[in-house]
Amino acid sequence: MSLIECKNINRCFGSGENRVHILKDISLSIEKGDFVAIIGQSGSGKSTLMNILGCLDTAGSGSYRIDGIETAKMQPDELAALRRERFGFIFQRYNLLSSLTARDNVALPAVYMGMGGKERSARADKLLQDLGLASKEGNKPGELSGGQQQRVSIARALMNGGEIIFADEPTGALDTASGKNVMEIIRRLHEAGHTVIMVTHDPGIAANANRVIEIRDGEIISDTSKNPEIPASNVGRIREKASWSFYYDQFVEAFRMSVQAVLAHKMRSLLTMLGIIIGIASVVSVVALGNGSQKKILEDISSMGTNTISIFPGRGFGDRRSGKIKTLTIDDAKIIAKQSYVASATPMTSSGGTLTYRNTDLTASLYGVGEQYFDVRGLKLETGRLFDENDVKEDAQVVVIDQNVKDKLFADSDPLGKTILFRKRPLTVIGVMKKDENAFGNSDVLMLWSPYTTVMHQITGESHTNSITVKIKDNANTRVAEKGLAELLKARHGTEDFFMNNSDSIRQMVESTTGTMKLLISSIALISLVVGGIGVMNIMLVSVTERTKEIGIRMAIGARRGNILQQFLIEAVLICIIGGLVGVGLSAAVSLVFNHFVTDFPMDISAASVIGAVACSTGIGIAFGFMPANKAAKLNPIDALAQD
């Protein structure tokens, strides 16, 4: 069985009136270890035939078999495997990647074979040394002469074994001396057992082969052999290694090429990233503002008491009849405090009036509360003490004042132990509260706190309370507790003449509202991300067009479609991730400036928003980079190689 066997191969280009029949019923067979020269003038079809034999192109009709296997039935990746494992190409124009060194160009086919990095470099250096380029491993193609570049191309063809060498006009771009040197190398390869198929228009070059096939106008007109003896082929084939390093090395290579592509066009890459940068910075900043404002509001709510339920007379805030309802009593508070899910219950009554100290009269509000009130409301003592259970039982004439009262009446003295008059009733100051920075409402109001028994019995003379503040135990559900309290009070009062304000409900409402606002504004900011993604897609399409030749070279040496897809997809994702990280950094800088000048609430950048931003930019890279990458992966190798 012949190594290569073609029967009735036809290839046409164009369609309709422009249809050109390049190859016409070509039939031939090539044995293992043969040295065949295909000769003909320009346009004769010799290069087209070699491209079909090298699986860079496909025949329009006919049969082409390698070791008896029909190539027409092979998938693109199966054809890539043939090029990778059995073929080696020597091109007239060398087709080296200008961004890689001689060593890296030679080693590139082995990347797609899964060969380890050290083994790959050692083999590449050995091949370069054998071809007289031992001192040129680190040189890039632009630093080498034409003859040296062609020898690098030959070394690359041998990297994976090169059982079958395809040489397309190997001396066409070389001077006479370099051409002779290259032909001597090719003859030695044949003598070593490689099957060599060479295309040339020069009869003198063709004379080096054992067999010469002449083509004219797409047809074989002669097939002569001058030496029927074919040396035994002992060329070892390097097998693909499917290990973790196989995938790792291919990813590293794709990543390295992506970085080089990004750095090669710095300004273009920066402008491409700009949409991503603005979009990510906008989203992260909006979320940070939302987090900061939500945190501030929730802190304010917490200052009013956590896990608390406040009970008021009436049907709701603004109920005009609430002042006439006097059914909320101290006994209600005592019964509520005994419930299993209640930590404490403190009644509250209030009174407005004139506060007098020496010759100063001020308008203030006095609140009658229980000893637990301050803990429930999260109020902190600055100096002195709070009243206790005994003070409540004994109707003690003591009072705790806020910072506003202290500043107005005791700016230059210690208020503790001083007696003040409220509605002409003497009260002894026993404590001063810290200023409540998180409190709602007017911060200039003068506030006093005394035992509710003192206020009710000695000042207002009323037996009912304005409200009851209930602290729910940490392990209890506030909604269930609210329902239980409602049933308890309805049973006591015989009607629902009260309403409740659950701090947990307020918290949930704030979280829901701020979450909705963040989502709304983030959705607007996401538009710039979509615009940025379109920019990435556009620039990647340009990149594919610019690097079509590179894609063709990689396919010729055995890259799968997946390898090409991976490389360009990584490039798109890399641009987006860098843009995302810069966007996060920009948002962090804005946050620092904002927090320096604005003290009402901070910009709070969370780890979740940063992770989400990077994930979002990665997703955009994948989504908008897939189409250009897929376009690159589906290019026909010979069409890609034909691009300049």
UniProtKB/Swiss-Prot annotation:
Keywords assigned by UniProt, alphabetized: Antibiotic resistance, ATP-binding, Cell inner membrane, Cell membrane, Membrane, Nucleotide-binding, Translocase, Transmembrane, Transmembrane helix, Transport
GO molecular function: ATP binding; ATP hydrolysis activity; transmembrane transporter activity
Similarity field: Belongs to the ABC transporter superfamily. Macrolide exporter (TC 3.A.1.122) family.
SUPFAM superfamilies linked: P-loop containing nucleoside triphosphate hydrolases
PROSITE patterns linked: ABC_TRANSPORTER_1 (PS00211), ABC_TRANSPORTER_2 (PS50893), MACB (PS51267)
Protein EC: 7.6.2.-
Pfam families, A to Z: ABC_tran (PF00005), FtsX (PF02687), MacB_PCD (PF12704)
A single GO BP: response to antibiotic
Membrane association type: Multi-pass membrane protein
Purpose of the protein: Non-canonical ABC transporter that contains transmembrane domains (TMD), which form a pore in the inner membrane, and an ATP-binding domain (NBD), which is responsible for energy generation. Confers resistance against macrolides.
Full protein name: Macrolide export ATP-binding/permease protein MacB
Superkingdom assignment: Bacteria
Chain residues that bind ATP: G40, Q41, S42, G43, S44, G45, K46, S47
Compartments it resides in: Cell inner membrane
Subunit structure, interactors included: Homodimer.
Residue stretches spanning the membrane: 270-290, 524-544, 574-594, 607-627
Annotated CDD domains: ABC_MJ0796_LolCDE_FtsE (cd03255)
Class of this enzyme: translocase
UniProt KW Signal keyword: no
GO cellular component, one term: plasma membrane
Record domain ABC transporter: where: 4-242
